[in-house]
């Protein structure tokens, strides 16, 4: 049986390994991910925020330690979020279908990349004829049961350019507060990075 000479085998093996490693790596580099995640918050908050990434197995990896109690990440379909500790508890409870903590939390989603969400169904993953899908664009969220006391509109069909309550009547009801002008609209999907 013919064999490859060592002079060919080693470079060929290295190319094969590099190709396999490259094919297995998905998503942005850590540096790219950090930059994307930090785009969710104002610069003053982003400078001292932690950056975390949820791995495919559900494990949270800290890419950068923080100093101000905020954690920034890329979520779902690429949306960027920067949340304080109370908000992180709120979203953890939501993910586990558990009652949220009785604490107010602040979350920034300022990057302008918003794939939207159901205004009525906390676990809806896509638009349907009756789940009142809304795309808000850049916004902040006030989460926690006390957010109801803000007195914002709680209709199901909202104007996403004005503050409103999302997921009304569920334990995860929270305030959505758009920022920027009413002309601020998310970029088309093809233009998003």
Residue ranges and their predicted role:
Residues 1-11:
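Bacterial N-terminal signal peptides that target proteins for export
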Residues 9-19:
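Bacterial N-terminal signal peptides
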Residues 25-193:
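Primary mode marks residue(s) on the alpha4-beta5-alpha5 output face of response regulator receiver
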């Amino acid at each position: 049986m013919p064999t490859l000479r060592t002079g060919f085998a080693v470079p060929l093996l290295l190319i094969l390994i590099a190709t396999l490693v490259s094919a297995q790596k998905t998503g942005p580099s850590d540096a790219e991910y950090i930059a994307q995640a930090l785009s969710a918050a104002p610069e003053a908050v982003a400078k001292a925020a932690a950056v975390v990434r949820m791995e495919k197995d559900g494990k949270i990896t800290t890419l950068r330690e923080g100093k101000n109690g905020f954690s920034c990440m890329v979520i779902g379909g690429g949306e960027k979020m920067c949340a304080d500790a109370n908000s992180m508890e709120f979203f953890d409870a939501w993910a586990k279908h558990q009652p949220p903590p009785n604490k107010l939390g602040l979350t920034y989603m300022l990057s302008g990349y918003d794939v939207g969400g159901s205004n009525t169904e906390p676990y809806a993953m896509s638009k349907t004829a009756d789940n009142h899908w809304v795309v808000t664009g850049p916004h902040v969220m006030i989460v926690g049961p006390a957010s109801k006391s803000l007195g914002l509109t709680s209709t199901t069909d909202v104007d996403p350019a004005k503050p409103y309550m999302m997921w009304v009547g569920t334990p995860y009801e929270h305030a959505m507060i758009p920022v920027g002008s009413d002309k601020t609209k998310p970029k088309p999907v093809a233009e998003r990075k």
